[in-house]
């Protein structure tokens, strides 16, 4: 068998990794501006966390999780998303006793056994934030504003924020009852999966991507029409505060999100690509999740961003920066003394923040210069017995092939000046 990456996974190569670093750093910057702190949690959790947190009736739990028994017979699952793990972390480490709200962000890989067509992966990457402790609509607007401003900081201007409210467990009962009646009357048009959803959780039908189900959904009851006074007031306030935050939005009455823990505000951010909408961020409020997995009654809200989709979008729109050249300087050596001196010169340059590599393979000077050219170095330093004796080194400009003699003690200042031009 040929050894290769498993289906649905992808290696990130050196020529791509700078793009990942760019968006990761941008996300960190924006999160810090909003007062969020990074958390890191295990790649796997006890399966029960996702069964209770994400929901037994969701496609994620029923079809997509990577679950196995460990050697102790415990059921373990590779995380399919980040919210449940962050909620578990919040409970386990006693954050409920700290000042509220608590603001967390994370950068993770997640795992779902999905069809790999259409650019989907079985290991994929997410940026996410979670805000615990505030049930205020101000928090909803702040969270949506953070996501919106992250995308605009990357130069994306063809994005739309779609918002909705799916109400609380009290007012949702009436909505679900009417929704079930509507879909039951049209059950012959539903796909096989949605027939199963009809009894367990009819709201999941609104998420179905099958064309037949999408057509029926257009005339289905809308959760926004069944909101109680409290949920209605909350949603109106969210819209008011988004206006104040200068975040443009549209109300989409059929956004429900694919996870069972959501309450009240839900939202998606989509980008327009070739006249088609591509979801790049999704989130919402989950006021019962902490209690659902064994913690106190504490409200929460958050979102997740698909990194692979985001990078594809940035690349298509020409919004990624040029790859910075690494390394910038190559130290070519002649003889044993040259090798020893190369360590000293490289250490000096690296201390000044100049990316430097030294010859490691004992090649001829001609071969060393070819190598330096192939890896894109801007300058090569040549050091051997003659140069050491005089306290100098040769510096070759790899673009022009011109050479200058520079005193070793001045090499850092010389290259700093040249590399700035």
UniProtKB/Swiss-Prot annotation:
- Record's GO cellular component terms: cytoplasm
Give the domain of life. Answer: Bacteria
Q: What is this protein called?
A: Histidine--tRNA ligase
Give a yes or no for keyword Oxidoreductase in this entry: no
| The species this protein was found in | Caldicellulosiruptor bescii (strain ATCC BAA-1888 / DSM 6725 / KCTC 15123 / Z-1320) (Anaerocellum thermophilum)
Q: Which GO terms describe its molecular function?
A: ATP binding; catalytic activity, acting on a protein; histidine-tRNA ligase activity; transferase activity
Query: Keywords for this entry?
Result: Aminoacyl-tRNA synthetase, ATP-binding, Cytoplasm, Ligase, Nucleotide-binding, Protein biosynthesis
- Establish whether keyword Ligase is in the entry: yes
């Amino acid at each position: 068998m040929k050894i290769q990456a498993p289906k649905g996974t992808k290696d990130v190569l050196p020529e791509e990794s700078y793009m990942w670093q760019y968006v990761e750093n941008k996300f960190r910057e924006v999160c810090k501006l909003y007062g969020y702190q990074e958390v890191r949690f295990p790649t796997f959790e006890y399966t029960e966390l996702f069964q209770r947190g994400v929901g037994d009736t969701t496609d994620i739990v029923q079809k997509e999780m990577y679950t196995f028994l460990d050697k102790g017979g415990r059921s373990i699952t590779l995380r399919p998303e980040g919210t449940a793990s962050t909620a578990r972390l919040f409970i386990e480490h006693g954050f409920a006793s700290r000042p509220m709200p608590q603001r967390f962000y994370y950068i993770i890989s997640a795992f779902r056994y999905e069809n790999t067509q259409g650019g989907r992966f079985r290991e994929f990457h997410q940026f996410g934030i979670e805000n615990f402790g505030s049930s205020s609509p101000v928090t909803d607007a702040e969270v949506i504003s953070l996501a919106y401003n992250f995308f605009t900081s990357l130069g994306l201007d063809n994005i739309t924020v779609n918002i909705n409210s799916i109400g609380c467990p009290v007012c949702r009962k009436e909505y679900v009852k009417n929704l079930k009646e509507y879909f039951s009357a049209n059950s012959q048009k539903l796909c096989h999966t949605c027939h199963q959803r009809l009894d367990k959780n009819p709201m999941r039908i609104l998420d179905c991507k099958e064309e037949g189900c999408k057509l029926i959904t257009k005339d289905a009851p809308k959760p926004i029409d069944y909101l109680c006074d409290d949920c209605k007031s909350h949603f109106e306030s969210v819209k008011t505060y988004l206006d104040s935050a200068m975040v443009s939005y549209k109300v989409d009455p059929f956004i429900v999100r694919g996870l069972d823990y959501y309450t009240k505000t839900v939202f998606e951010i989509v980008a327009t690509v070739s006249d088609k909408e591509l979801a790049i961020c999704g989130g919402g409020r989950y006021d019962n999740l902490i209690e659902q997995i064994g913690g106190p009654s504490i409200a929460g809200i958050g979102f997740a961003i698909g990194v692979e989709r985001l990078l594809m979008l940035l690349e298509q729109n020409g919004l990624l920066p040029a790859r910075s050249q690494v390394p910038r300087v190559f130290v070519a050596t002649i003889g044993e003394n040259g090798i020893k001196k190369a360590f000293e010169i490289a250490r000096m340059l690296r201390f000044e923040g100049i990316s430097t590599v030294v010859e490691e393979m004992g090649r001829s000077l001609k071969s060393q210069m070819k190598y330096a050219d192939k890896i894109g170095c801007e300058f090569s330093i040549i050091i051997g017995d003659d140069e050491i004796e005089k306290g100098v080194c040769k510096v070759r400009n790899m673009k022009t092939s011109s050479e200058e003699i520079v005193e070793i003690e001045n090499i850092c200042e010389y290259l700093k000046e040249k590399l700035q031009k």
